[in-house]
Amino acid sequence: MPLGLKPCCAVCKTQSSSMWKKGNQGEILCNGCTGKAVSSGGSGASASSTIQQNNGGGKQSKQEIHRRSARLRSTKYKAPASEKKVSTKGKGRRHIFKLKNPIKAPESVSTIITSESMFYKGIYYQIGDVIKVIDEDDGKPYYAQIRGFVQDQYCEKSAALTWLIPTQASPRDRFDPSTYIVGPEEDLPRKMEYLEFVCHAPSEYFKSRSCPFPTLPVRPEKGYVWTHIGPTPAVAIKETVG
């Protein structure tokens, strides 16, 4: 029974009963009238006809309205859901990178590689080579000797230098190794892009103040790695042979 409606027996019109049942034609019967309706089918049929007559005149009981409304089904045609279109294009970069969880890149560790030689801009440098550095302030050249090479993790090449100090005999327009003195060593390396190659390691060391023997050659020396650039005094063949 729907909520809020009190049942009423179709035969005896009572509204109190320990148990309610429905007859063969859907009428409501109390517990006392249930046995009578089963024994006398004719009486049940007449009772049901009287119910229909009493409820006639274009009005239906609330029970029957509720029972019919529960059986109503929508007859409106529903078109089947269209299939989802599958994109045939390639997947974008955002989809590719989101497939996996992002991983934090490891911190870069500074690694330094030292070597005794280095190839830079078509020139093969070695330890002991002489280079030239131009000062930005006065524009004068300063000479130094390479004592080591350094390369970092970004392939940036540098060189550790030992400065060469000129003397009064050092020419101003060219480099003469025999007239320079070995100076202080520089602590920090300099980039190779600021260095200009002069010559490879000379055949002899630079001029030494404490050397007991003269370092300046008495006569022209030939067949060495370096030699003077410029005119040399003419020497007789006999002197060179002797």
UniProtKB/Swiss-Prot annotation:
Zinc fingers (GATA-type) by residue: 9-33
Domain of life: Eukaryota
Disordered: region residues: 44-85
GO biological process, one term: chromatin organization
Keywords of this entry: Metal-binding, Nucleus, Zinc, Zinc-finger
GO MF terms held by the record: sequence-specific DNA binding; zinc ion binding
InterPro entries per record: GATAD1 (IPR039050), Znf_GATA (IPR000679)
An example Gene Ontology CC term for this record: nucleus
Composition bias type Low complexity, residue spans: 45-54
Cell compartment(s), UniProt: Nucleus
PROSITE patterns according to UniProt: GATA_ZN_FINGER_2
Function: Component of some chromatin complex recruited to chromatin sites methylated 'Lys-4' of histone H3 (H3K4me), with a preference for trimethylated form (H3K4me3).
Name of the protein: GATA zinc finger domain-containing protein 1
